[in-house]
């Protein structure tokens, strides 16, 4: 909020901006954004899908705060779990090689109607499919699941998924 250079007190600016966050992004604004992204991309783009985490170890008043594997502290031999949220992101590279998001969702297994991380990933895949038609989906380890292969085959999409070594 310092970057806005407004004469108002910081707390008032935060309150004003927070009120609008509750409403979310309107469907027309989201659609206009995605149509602009489509203009910036190639005819058959590469869509990268990946999960991340947002860790809130000291949080206790956050809605639906779950337990996530902390990617910053975990190693291949040791997993560290903390309070936080999962983040699923899908992005493309524009014709000028800039990454641009086409899907972003913060989610938690503690949400009321939460089904699974795969459900969120399928939403990202469907978003890319509906926006571009034909694309190549690229995903890292963790997505090497028959459900992913079947979903992408069902939609007639090309894909590259790095497999786990085990």
What are the language-model segments listed below?
Residues 1-166:
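Conserved, well-structured functional cores that handle cations and Mg-NTP chemistry
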